[in-house]
UniProtKB/Swiss-Prot annotation:
Gene responsible for this protein: ispD
PROSITE patterns tied to this protein: ISPD (PS01295)
Matches recorded under NCBIfam families: ispD (TIGR00453)
Organism: Neisseria meningitidis serogroup B (strain ATCC BAA-335 / MC58)
Role played: Catalyzes the formation of 4-diphosphocytidyl-2-C-methyl-D-erythritol from CTP and 2-C-methyl-D-erythritol 4-phosphate (MEP).
Site (Positions MEP for the nucleophilic attack): R158, K212
Reactions mediated catalytically: 2-C-methyl-D-erythritol 4-phosphate + CTP + H(+) = 4-CDP-2-C-methyl-D-erythritol + diphosphate
Species classification: Bacteria, Pseudomonadati, Pseudomonadota, Betaproteobacteria, Neisseriales
Name of this protein: 2-C-methyl-D-erythritol 4-phosphate cytidylyltransferase
Amino acid sequence: MKRKNIALIPAAGIGARFGADKPKQYVEIGSKTVLEHTIGIFERHEAVDLTVVVVSPEDTFADKVQTAFPQVRVWKNGGQTRAETVRNGVAKLLETGLAAETDNILVHDAARCCLPSEALTRLIEQAGNAAEGGILAIPIADTLKCADGGNISATVERTSLWQAQTPQLFRAGLLHRALAAENLDGITDEASAVEKLGVRPLLIQGDVRNLKLTQPQDAYIVRLLLDAV
């Protein structure tokens, strides 16, 4: 039986650092919201079988997304944190039978709307059949400094350091177990949850274009990248 690839996009955050009058995933760039651009990446990819977006129960913007993508599942069962939102989404996928424990879940940041299709293909091809799963990541290029107040306290050896990106691909059953803990403090991505089970996910070469919209100035770069597609 073919293993399904299911994109899960947690979109329950408010994007406080972005400083807009709405969550950053609903900021419009061109004629579409950031979230619509992100969903389109997965909907256009032939290896992705289903896309699920998990939003806050209080979300008032999601209806537009559902109208634009009627085939996408938009669920209002997001949690207080990213980890809780992903946990709720994976649990519902398993409960409804839309995913089996052996299917792949590709968790992707709603605010990474410039993911190149070739990077997504690379992740699926290299990690899709790996029991330990894998994530997109790029080697750290800049020199890193530790700070003590406003002063440098140390320079960090960067040889073995990678910057994690998304999607992060794991079997549904593994991800469900990894996020089952009552206390998810310190879990900043799916890989960190899986690592707590002793699993060592694969590092798959990511792409510098796969940036996360975080600060207002990021919108300028994102707009240029989207215009170049």
